[in-house]
Amino acid sequence: MKTTITLITAMLLLLTTGEDALRAQTDVPPAGARYGVKSAIIKKSFYGPGGDREITIYIDDYGAREAEEDRMGKHQSLRIRNEKDKTEVVVDFSERTVNIGGWESKRQINYRHLKLGELERYGLTEAGTKVLLGKTCRVYKQNTWLKSYMVTVTHYVWEGINLKSDLKYDEVPGWEEREEVKSIQVNVDVPQEKFQIPRGFKVKDWRGR
């Protein structure tokens, strides 16, 4: 009896794994999709002069909805971007406040549909590839101004998703910010509360001002 149960369990596991693999192979992004995967949960750590942070990114509907959860000590915030209604919501859990503003995806670098002319406009140069947690990323170098400093940023992009960015201040040796990707889950169920405004928070809507 025990052997039979073990065989059944093994067969169910094999079927489940096969279904996941088939879904990943047949999941074709719609035309113009921001990202090449339907959903994802990405966890990474940030290290910089201003303090270390833990970041979790939630992606749904090929990037039409995206949320970035940021934790630094006791402070927690959530930034929600919705491409459909062109909004960006910033939730501060410490202050229990919500700020709603406009957001246009065209202001962000769309790596999946990056055109040759945009490389120059954004100050990007292609710098080969690198594998992060089994994902082959396109590497881009970017020279840009951050406040009054010239910085060099290295972006690691997979399926249009900027998995990590490392930043170095050109004029301040040793002063840098870097990210480390901890885990990548693809085509998973994303908690829908990550895209919702918490109840009981003070809401400020800045749109149209």
Predicted features and spans:
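Signal peptide-directed secreted proteins
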Residues: 156-209
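Extended beta-strand-rich segments in extracellular/periplasmic secretory proteins, especially
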Residues: 28-37, 111-164, 201-206
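Short, solvent-exposed coil/turn segments at beta-strand boundaries
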Residues: 34-39, 57-67, 79-87, 135, ...
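Sec-dependent signal peptide recognition
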Residues: 2-8, 20
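An acidic-aromatic
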Residues: 54-114, 168-181
